Amino acid sequence: MKTLGEFIVEKQHEFSHATGELTALLSAIKLGAKIIHRDINKAGLVDILGASGAENVQGEVQQKLDLFANEKLKAALRARDIVAGIASEEEDEIVVFEGCEHAKYVVLMDPLDGSSNIDVNVSVGTIFSIYRRVTPVGTPVTEEDFLQPGNRQVAAGYVVYGSSTMLVYTTGCGVHAFTYDPSLGVFCLCQERMRFPEKGNTYSINEGNYIKFPQGVKKYIKYCQEEDKETQRPYTSRYIGSLVADFHRNLLKGGIYLYPSTASHPDGKLRLLYECNPMAFLAEQAGGKASDGKERILDIIPESLHQRRSFFVGNNHMVEDVENFIKAFPDA
């Protein structure tokens, strides 16, 4: 049995900037995940379910667990003195860690993706993305350090809190998964160099919004539902409502996750920096593809911290199919 800590140290030579700091940073995220795992499992007993009464910068009602997870992860990262600052879905602006001007890394995160599912005991997750800062070491970080394209990520991953808790990450040398053993308090390696299956047959989208989707996406959904033995259609529809949970299922079973633009969200709804980019990095490392329907996600130059984007991620052939439909059926 190999633990996450042992695996990271063993693979450190594959990382061109290996100094031990990234290992410590991932260890801090691991600690935060353990704390979140512990308290999610007793959320109904300690009054951290439901809405907090506050809204985040996007105007979304914050769940109590959103704020709880944000504070726990922030504290875990701050305590190690190896992160110069963070950006979070739950923070209006970047958080600069005073006294950590010497640190080389910044972290972007969605502390608890799908938190509205907690009340009904459905899987939720944590998403994180790690970059080397671009401003001089020794100075406070600025927003410039966070507004980098996804192709500059040095590591990314997620934690899915479900029937078991799993941490999945990449440093650009494959995707690896670890299952949490609560009796030992450690994450143990369960899958090394994960890959999307060669063919996917699942599409994950909130079809309740069908009438609001662009024409190309509507046509693709109908394509998925049509019978065709040669392409093994119709495909199966599976939608959990948590990006982490839907992505994780499709990574294991094969499929595509779709979150297109709508009239009310013309730029899409998912956040580019701390949702789309890390999942796109993982997808490509697992042999998949991620796009906004027209452009590779990892090549998009971000313009703002909480920028949104349409998002299509999964098996190569499925993402290419939806891109072709979007191109063939443009909205007037």
Curated annotation (Swiss-Prot):
UniProt cofactor(s): Mg(2+)
SUPFAM superfamilies: Carbohydrate phosphatase (SSF56655)
One Pfam family in the UniProt entry: FBPase
GO BP, sorted A to Z: fructose 1,6-bisphosphate metabolic process; fructose 6-phosphate metabolic process; fructose metabolic process; gluconeogenesis; sucrose biosynthetic process
Key words of the record: Carbohydrate metabolism, Cytoplasm, Hydrolase, Magnesium, Metal-binding
Pathway info: Carbohydrate biosynthesis; gluconeogenesis
GO CC term (a single one): cytosol
Annotated positions binding Mg(2+) 2: D110, D113, E275
Chief place where the protein resides: cytoplasm
EC number: 3.1.3.11
Residues the record lists as binding Mg(2+) 1: E89, D110, L112
Enzyme class, UniProt record, top EC level: hydrolase
Keyword Signal: no
Gene3D superfamilies reported in the protein's UniProt record: 3.40.190.80, Fructose-1,6-Bisphosphatase, subunit A, domain 1
Cofactor comment text: Binds 2 magnesium ions per subunit.
GO MF annotation terms: fructose 1,6-bisphosphate 1-phosphatase activity; magnesium ion binding
Chemical reaction(s) catalysed: beta-D-fructose 1,6-bisphosphate + H2O = beta-D-fructose 6-phosphate + phosphate
Residues where substrate binds: D113, G114, S115, S116, N206, Y239, Y257, L258, Y259, K269
Quaternary assembly: Homotetramer.
Family: Belongs to the FBPase class 1 family.
Protein name per the record: Fructose-1,6-bisphosphatase class 1
Source organism per UniProt: Klebsiella pneumoniae (strain 342)
Encoding gene, per UniProt annotation: fbp
